[in-house]
Amino acid sequence: MFDVEKIRADFPLLSTEVYGRPLVYLDSGATAQKPRCVIDTVDYLHRELNANIHRGVHRLAEEATERYEAARDRIRAFIGAAHREEVVF
């Protein structure tokens, strides 16, 4: 069984109170709340590795491309896709 409180704890915004009650976010059609690990990773990428993928020949672009393709490979394996090219962000 899922521990709802543990899952909620991964999403910083969900610790917010609205009118003295815990926030319940039901507008996922417009955007989705991000867990702390996503927020931290995006923050790191913007601070340390902000470059275009598949376009540059400098170190930052090459590392960004490697990380992008590694993410596609992980998602490909998770969803059972045959090829990384089937994973599109």
Protein language model features and the residues they cover:
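Pyridoxal 5′-phosphate
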Residues: M1-F89
